[in-house]
Amino acid sequence: MSRVAKAPVNIPAGVEVKLDGQLLTVKGKNGELSRKIHESVEVKQDNGQFTFTPREGFVEANAQSGTARALVNAMVIGVTEGFTKKLVLVGVGYRAQLKGNAIALSLGYSHPVEHTLPVGITAECPSQTEIVLKGADKQLIGQVAADIRAYRRPEPYKGKGVRYADEVVRIKEAKKK
């Protein structure tokens, strides 16, 4: 059995969890998330805890049980506390601006880049060079942040581009004569 799957997921007060076959729905103050659990994983609910055990006859059961536990734990944290991801724009003239449900980015191209935010994700710009993404779905937050970063990835010589707040860009040395 996976080491991750051995630990049960505790369900805090104010969170409603519904298990319908292999479909798990978690509802809390930040919204509602649902996910289909792999058929090789058996989910048991008892007194405010969920346990995940691998089923016999499946090769991938051990790995899937740990994955399922981690995903459900992220869902519970997402609907209670939520997740945030911070992006920083580094470069002369690089700016971000909120326009309703979209982010307008000036990234050195001849045109502004507009990125529409999916449902469940909110953004704020504390300054022109910072973007803070918030939401309940950890995977979706990471995907939106990666999509925005992909418009202008940090280049290795000056470090200009869109980067995560905790990202360290290794700067290469310029060519010498």
From Swiss-Prot:
One of its GO terms (molecular function) is rRNA binding. It comes from Haemophilus influenzae (strain ATCC 51907 / DSM 11121 / KW20 / Rd). SUPFAM superfamilies: Ribosomal protein L6. The gene is rplF. It holds the Pfam family Ribosomal_L6. HAMAP family: Ribosomal_uL6_B. InterPro entries: Ribosomal_uL6-like (IPR000702), Ribosomal_uL6-like_a/b-dom_sf (IPR036789), Ribosomal_uL6_a/b-dom (IPR020040), Ribosomal_uL6_bac-type (IPR019906), Ribosomal_uL6_CS (IPR002358). This is Large ribosomal subunit protein uL6. Keywords: Ribonucleoprotein, Ribosomal protein, RNA-binding, rRNA-binding.
